[in-house]
């Protein structure tokens, strides 16, 4: 059931391929990102996968530059997106909160202020 939710989210993302990214960036639009995060959080609740969400609090870079730089610091299975609040988040698939601390450290070393989000409503 959870796997189906993730598959549905991925199909949804594929169907909206041209509309899912903020123009000129590799950052997922709020609706597409929210759908993906919901699927991963639901799967995590059912103990089918691990995932961690990191909020990027601030950076001296433009959103486009931040997205490009973050993508280079993450795996291909991870995602960069925004919610309606306009803030950038990184969704780390198959990553526990403990393991995400290493990614958070890497982000900080590259000039990003960030914070692991334990409880987030989507």
Predicted features, each with a name:
Residues 23, 27-48, 67-75:
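Short regulatory alpha-helical coupling segments
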Residues 47-60:
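Short glycine-/aliphatic-rich beta-strand segments at the starts of folded cytosolic domains
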Residues 6-10, 44, 111:
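Conserved NTP-handling cores and scaffolds of large molecular machines
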Residues 71, 101-113:
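Alpha-helical scaffold within the catalytic cores of cyclic-nucleotide enzymes
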Residues 1-15:
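Signal-transmission/dimerization alpha-helices at domain junctions
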Residues 12-26, 116-122:
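Flexible, glycine/charge-rich interdomain/linker segments that couple
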Residues 60, 67-101:
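Conserved helix-loop-beta segment at the catalytic/binding core of cyclic-nucleotide signaling proteins
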């Amino acid at each position: 059931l959870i796997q189906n939710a993730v598959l549905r989210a991925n199909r949804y993302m594929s169907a909206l391929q041209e509309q899912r990214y903020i123009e000129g960036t590799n950052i997922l639009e709020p609706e597409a990102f929210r759908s993906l995060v919901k699927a991963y959080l639901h799967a995590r609740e059912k103990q089918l996968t691990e995932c961690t969400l990191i909020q990027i609090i601030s950076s001296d870079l433009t959103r486009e530059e931040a997205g490009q730089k973050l993508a280079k610091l993450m795996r291909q299975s991870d995602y960069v997106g925004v919610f309606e609040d306009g803030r950038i988040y990184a969704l780390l698939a198959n990553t526990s909160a403990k393991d995400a601390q290493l990614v958070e450290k890497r982000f900080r070393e590259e000039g990003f202020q960030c914070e692991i989000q334990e409880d987030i409503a989507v």
